[in-house]
Amino acid sequence: MKIITKTIRRAYNNWNPTKLIRCYHYAAAFDGSKMICFTQNNPIKTHTGAYRIGENYNISKYKEFPYYHSESRLISELLDMYNTISSDWSVVVMRINRLGKILGSKPCENCDKLLRSVGLEKIFYSNDCGDFIDGLNHRMIVDAVDISY
């Protein structure tokens, strides 16, 4: 699947391991196979945008701890850029630890609620084996490069 390959490539290009951060989460939105937005979490710095997402979507954890998750930052940036979100768009979420290994990145309960509340259902995420799961069907994507969605 081209969108997964594009996300992996972009994530490793942005990956900058430090001792302060044990892993990085990345999220990418696609319109067809075109990447329209790419984001990364920031577990160190609070952000008013994360707080605003918590307010707008009634997510108390984001209000209490206003740190962007990659998914919430993706939604915020998509709304800033397009003022709307299409249910036809796909989202790929992945995590890379400081050693460069792809790990599980299934969206947390709050991020899942947020993604679904804006109509995004085509969500793909990495597992601890470095494979990707189709979040809608809960099936592993066998060969991420050859499958088209």
Regions found by a protein language model. Name each.
Residues 1-149:
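Zinc-dependent deaminase catalytic domain
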